[in-house]
Regions:
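Charged, often Cys/His-bearing segments associated with DNA-binding zinc-finger transcription factors
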Residues: 2, 8, 12-81, 86, ...
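Helix-centered, glycine/charged polyanion-binding patches within enzymatic domains
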Residues: 31, 36-41, 231-303
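Short polar catalytic/cofactor-binding loops
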Residues: 48-50, 159, 251
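Polybasic low-complexity intrinsically disordered regions
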Residues: 77-93, 101-107, 111, 115, ...
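Short arginine-rich
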Residues: 120-123, 330
Length: 343
């Protein structure tokens, strides 16, 4: 078959092997009816008792304002000249996490945390709401977990967080001109095995996904086996960044994509697309479906912590977003459902 370019012998053998192996699979059904012949997969949660306990603990105040926060609430040393700040970065981070988890404006947040300290007979006070707003612009928030070792599959994607604008109902009924709707774009990299967010970055809405991709990979020094993303990441810069990490790229080439230089890992996906007319069989062969874990993570961010940013300053929005990511990783650490396929 003429696929537009002479590929290496190794690539040709791989393509032929894929062709022979996949012809005997479920794709033997006609393209118009194979989906209807496949029943919807069913899964059973095997650790429901532990997961149910984790869901209950999500609302525990002592989980969010813990002993570490009590001990390091006030800042003792600043590391530079001048009077030290009264509240530590951990205090500001904790306040921002509580704000997102319990969906509170800043003033209500201050009263809420003060009441917690009062009920617990702890001689601490919450930072003033203006202090939280100001410190959010420069607070150092580390959302990385203590998990170590190689990452088998890292899934990368992006979603939008609304700053302000018309509600969805008004847009549905009357439409919008888009002038008063402001968004920020959240880029995340998720470990598909643990559901932990390994890297994250907030950008303006006009920044493309591919522009942020290399910066996400620079945020972790752990070894990565596979890195997946959608077609928006099918660029030279993204593939070069993956090559630096010595990982396997799982990025579907765009429709009508051309081969790159001889021996490039992307050529196998391009050849498969030209051979079968689409990327479907390539996705099945190499487990591209794992990328959906990144979409699950974005859904969890919006469902559990809200899809709208309340702080108006961009730098403060970055701090608020990183507090959301840290909170989500804490929720993930409590426990996730373990499922088993039911035949």
């Amino acid at each position: 078959m003429d696929i537009g370019m002479v590929v290496t012998l190794e690539e040709a053998l791989l393509l032929k092997s894929m062709e022979l192996n996949l012809e005997a699979t479920i794709w033997s059904a006609t393209p118009t009816d194979h989906r209807s012949l496949m029943p919807k997969p069913r899964y059973k949660t095997t650790n429901w008792k532990q997961y149910n306990k984790a869901l209950i603990n999500r609302g525990s105040l002592t989980f969010w304002i813990d002993e570490e926060a009590f001990a390091e609430w006030n800042q003792n040393k600043q590391g530079k000249r001048g009077r030290p700040r009264r509240f530590s970065d951990l205090a500001i981070t904790t306040a921002l996490m509580v704000k997102r988890v319990f969906s509170m404006p800043l003033r209500a947040l201050q009263g809420f945390i003060d009441s917690v300290f009062k009920l617990a007979n702890i001689p601490l006070v919450c930072p003033h709401y203006t202090c939280i707003s100001r410190r959010a612009k420069e607070v150092e928030i580390s959302f990385k977990t203590k998990t170590r070792g190689a990452i088998q599959h890292l899934a990368i994607d992006a979603t939008g967080l609304k700053v302000y604008g018309e509600g969805e109902w008004k847009v549905k009924k009357h439409g919008t001109d888009g002038k008063r709707r402001v968004w920020r774009k959240l880029h995340i990299a998720v470990d598909t095995s643990t559901h932990e967010i390994i890297a994250a970055e907030l950008s303006l809405s006009n920044v493309t996904d591919a522009e942020v991709f290399p910066n996400l990979l620079k945020q972790t020094h752990r070894k990565i086996i596979e890195i997946s993303g959608d077609g928006a990441y099918d660029t030279r810069d993204c593939h070069d960044a993956i090559r630096v990490k010595r990982a396997v790229p799982l990025i579907p080439p765009r429709e009508g994509a051309a081969f790159w230089e001889q021996g490039h890992p992307r050529n196998l996906a391009v050849g498969c697309q030209k051979l079968y007319g689409s990327n479907k069989k390539w996705k099945m062969r190499y487990g591209y479906h794992k990328r959906s874990i990144s979409e699950t993570a974005m859904y969890r961010v919006k469902q559990l912590l809200g899809g709208k940013l309340s702080l108006r300053n961009y730098n403060a929005q970055v701090g608020e977003t990183y507090a959301m990511i840290k909170a989500l990783n804490k929720l993930t650490g409590l426990g996730m459902p373990e499922t088993q396929y039911i035949v």
